[in-house]
Regions:
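Generic secondary-structure signature for well-ordered alpha-helical cores
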Residues: 17-22, 51, 100, 126, ...
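Ligand/cofactor pocket segment of small-molecule handling proteins
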Residues: 91-129, 133
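Acidic, glycine-rich flexible loop/linker segments
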Residues: 126-163
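Short coil/turn connectors at secondary-structure junctions
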Residues: 40-42, 68-71, 97-100, 116-119, ...
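General beta-strand structural signal in soluble alpha/beta enzymes
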Residues: 24-27, 48, 74-76, 102-106, ...
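Buried hydrophobic positions in well-ordered alpha/beta secondary-structure cores of metabolic enzymes
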Residues: 16, 94, 155-157
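Extracellular/luminal Protease-associated
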Residues: 63-105
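Intrinsically disordered, low-complexity regions enriched in acidic/Ser/Thr/Pro/Gln residues
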Residues: 1-63
Length: 163
């Protein structure tokens, strides 16, 4: 959900740092498709692991068929997967189901298409190939670690064009 009156993420990070806390996820996460105004969502955490066998990412399609209103999807652990775990099709599905945005601790693809959709996507980088069956969704709504920061289910996430 976009919100007027919410300070920029950089200001929130500065206040957290002054308090001796962490909580910001950039870098290495950066906007692939940045939110033009501060956007808030409650974390829906998803753990992705690299493994040649298992259910693959099939469970994410079931997840994306439900109501995601106000949720910020946080995909943790995907950096080990040798390919993109997020792209245009998942972006379209998440937006249609009401999600606020997605943070991928891994690779994404289809930047031009995702930009046209206008859905906030943050990742560590881009990759042209998909996961080729080597990405497994192993947990949903558990505490995850992204860039040494713990993110629990329902934590408040704020993103903007800067991060």
């Amino acid at each position: 959900m976009t919100c007027s009156g919410v300070p920029p993420v950089s200001a929130i990070a500065d206040v957290l740092a002054l308090w001796g806390d962490d909580g910001w996820l950039t870098p290495p996460l950066h906007p692939v498709v940045g939110a033009p105004v501060p956007t808030i969502g409650r974390a829906l955490t998803i753990t992705i692991t690299f493994a040649p066998t298992g259910p693959g990412l099939e469970p994410i399609f079931e997840l994306l068929s439900g109501d995601l209103t106000g949720r910020m999807l946080v995909l943790a652990g995907a950096a080990a997967v040798p390919g993109a775990v997020w792209g245009e099709l998942l972006t379209r599905a998440a937006r249609q189901r009401g999600a606020s945005g997605v943070l991928v601790d891994g690779w994404v693809r289809d930047r031009p298409e995702m930009t046209a959709i206008g859905f906030p996507v943050y990742a560590i980088g881009e990759h042209v190939v998909g996961p080729n069956g080597q990405a497994q969704l192993t947990h949903i709504d558990t505490t995850v670690t992204v860039n040494e920061v713990c993110v629990a289910a329902d934590d408040v996430i704020v993103v903007d064009a800067g991060g």
